[in-house]
């Protein structure tokens, strides 16, 4: 099975024939913070849970968060949920204690990443 979670899936943070090259994605409906919650509930050792996720594309240590998102995952998932469910930016900003401009920028970034990576979420095309 694949390891791509909803946060990564919506924003295209996976490789189609890498971690996305699988017949089943059992985590694709869960945001990243939910995967961490389930891991703790299942008793996964903390060393594994707290290991920094990495795209493994640089020789220097860099986390997925630093490389792709620039937003802490806890906040990212709340923003992503609001974007996905079309919660107004003003409401999202008020609930999360953020400036509305910051929420608008995040939503614009999500939209751009989602559009730019749409091909990753579709089946490969045939010749006919």
Which stretches of residues belong to each language-model region?
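ATP/NTP-dependent adenylation/nucleotidyl-transfer catalytic domains that generate, transfer
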Residues: 2-128
């Amino acid at each position: 099975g694949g390891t791509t979670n909803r946060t990564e899936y919506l924003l295209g943070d996976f490789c189609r024939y890498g971690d996305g090259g699988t017949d089943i994605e059992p985590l694709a409906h869960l945001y990243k913070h939910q995967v961490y919650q389930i891991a703790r509930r299942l008793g996964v050792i903390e060393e594994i849970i707290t290991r920094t996720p990495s795209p493994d594309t640089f020789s220097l240590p860099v986390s997925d968060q630093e490389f792709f998102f620039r937003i802490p995952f806890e906040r990212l998932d709340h923003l992503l949920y609001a974007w996905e469910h079309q919660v107004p930016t003003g409401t999202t900003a008020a609930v999360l204690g953020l400036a509305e401009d910051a929420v608008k920028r995040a939503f614009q970034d999500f939209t751009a990443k989602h559009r730019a990576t749409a091909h990753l979420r579709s089946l490969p095309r045939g010749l006919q």
